[in-house]
Amino acid sequence: NDNVRWIPAWASNRIGSMVEERPDWCISRQRFWGVPIPVFKCKSCGEIVANEESFDAVIELFRTKGADAWYTTAPEDYLPSSVCCPNCGSHELEGEKDVLDVWWESGVSHTSVLGTRPYLHRPADLYLEGSDQHRGWFQSSLLTSVGAYGDAPYKAVLSCGFTVDENGRKMSKSIGNVIDPIEVCDEFGADVLRLWVGSVDYSQDMSVSRNIFERTSDAYRRIRNTFRYLLSNLNDFANADFVSADEMLEFDKWALSRLQALVAETTQAFDEYRFHNAYRAWYDFIVSISSEYFDAVKDRLYADAADSVERRSAQSVLADMLEAMVRQLAPILAFTCDEVWEKFPEGMMEEGRVAAVALAGWPDEEDFAPQLPASEREELLTSYEVVMEARDAVMKAIEEARNDGLFTKSQEAAATIMGNTELIEALGAHGLDTLAEIFIVSNVELEESDDADGFVASVSQAPGEKCPRCWNYRELGPDGLCERCHEVVAAFDMQADE
């Protein structure tokens, strides 16, 4: 038992106590169907005849004629002459009429299945069944394997609870609370059903209802929209466009560091069969990265020059996110991820690319471009904690200003952030332009105040005029555009003239 990994961990004590307290196992049953017990009785004295020679003869009989031959073929027709009663020496034998307990049949699958197929191996990597099988298949397999070979037939055993309705009641046709998975697939789609399965803690009974599937459908929609955001913003991106670590912007490095930390966390969760933890980590990441990063880099993605380092830097991160997300969520959202895999930007489809995401392999650190040293990733994640704290203060101030009717878009705002010297210095180290991008405002000012408890933010109307192209408030040139947009549009005009 100590050499087997039991999932959940408490199952180890459960199976241990059950085996310790169980009575002797009577493996014979009196039925007209089942697997025969391959032993013989002496017709003269009733002694049991069972030895290596008789077993080999029965094995060969079953191999050539099937198990029914036990009832249709006389023992003397297939037993060697050397097989006789060890008590009286008689050769007049009859086959046992009792059959094996069905738990013995399934319990020896480690030999009848794993031991006879060259593409399988024993012990099995995993046995998987409901929690009731601690008394059934898990236990019968353990007993027969230890008895025959001295060890367990499995490396790990995973047991799951049962589905109940939203009130915790067992599903029953008489109650009318049974939910047909086919109907769920027809109404919500197969991946919503799969997402529900992947999102629940299977170690205990799992509640299921229409309301739960509706909430799961909402979560699925958010994931699907994230895929759409990534695909649409990578339409013109190719693998040759990945920027180097030296070129990548700091804010993008932070997002990439978060992604790599997530992949490490979820990989461990999948390895430990904690699928609901892997899903929860991905979902929480999607929710937070959407507001903290996706919204912030839209300005670069939509308004910067198409092939600028700044835009390619953000796209490099989005490409890494797409690759990691589609590969890691494929075991749960099989159909959606295959659809995404087929819609990958043409420039990201390398020659020899596998046809299905299931064949693409699991993402690891080598799959990310650029490669960031672990020490740099940790430093970025730590240093950006203060940035996100300041962001929360700015977002709160913007929301209050919106409620007061001062403005509707955050780009209309200039943010002033106050904090003590240490906080302001740490925040200012990231650069005012970077902070303005993260906070999605047109201007940022920092002020030291020893009286401030944490960060205190206020917003006011940003100076300048609204650029009609990027919507940021800047000093506009003769063409009515900000300096950045003027340069981008001028480049377009030059290309058109050529």
Predicted regions and their residues:
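Cysteine-rich micro-motifs
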Residues: 85, 478-488
